[in-house]
Amino acid sequence: MSSREKEQTIALSAIFQAAELVSILAKTGQVDNASLQPLLESLLMVNAASTEDIYGGQWDYSTNLALGRKISRQALGKERSSVNPDTLRYALSLIHLENKLSKTPEMLSTIGQKIAQIEQKKAHYESVLHENMVASISGMYQDTLSKLSFRIQVHGDSRFLQQPQVANQVRAILMSGIRAAMLWRQLGGKRWHLIFKRKALLSALESRN
């Protein structure tokens, strides 16, 4: 097990956490803020000293990404059938969409500018979970990633998905998932690793218990 694989599991856990939260939110209209906050915070961590710092630091990242680590272990291990199919689809779609984004430098530049603007807004609100912060992150997704040819189709209860607050949360979570997918790629992660490097990734995930 390499240190690179250990770092990759952090990004992978964040991807699966985002995917699972979207799946839950789309069906119930509710989301666990303890799992949501570190994902949204990660969008503003543009100069983090380490991968761990992006999700809360050495002592907190493991707890912050506990849901994602659980889903990652299930998805890569023998419990794959227990993972919500929508969660798996969202996770793979996030990786695919980020790959398309990486080939669009102008859009990347726009996202960077918008993140800087959102970071300034945070000073006016108590938390990144404030509805205005979530709406700003959602708007960033709409103005950029929603314009690519590949779009993530979210399935759930229309009663919830038609609510502006829920729709904003969904897009904000997807944006955080793109952040995680970008980190995954920067750390050398590839989609085929989820098939052919499953044992190594599982070992790294288990080592973080």
Swiss-Prot record:
Keywords: Cell inner membrane, Cell membrane, Cytoplasm, Membrane. It is found in: Cytoplasm; Cell inner membrane. Belongs to the HflD family. It comes from the Bacteria. NCBIfam families: PRK00218.1-2 (NF001246). The gene is hflD. It is a peripheral membrane protein. This is High frequency lysogenization protein HflD homolog. Transmembrane segments: none annotated. Pfam families: DUF489. One of its GO terms (cellular component) is cytoplasm.
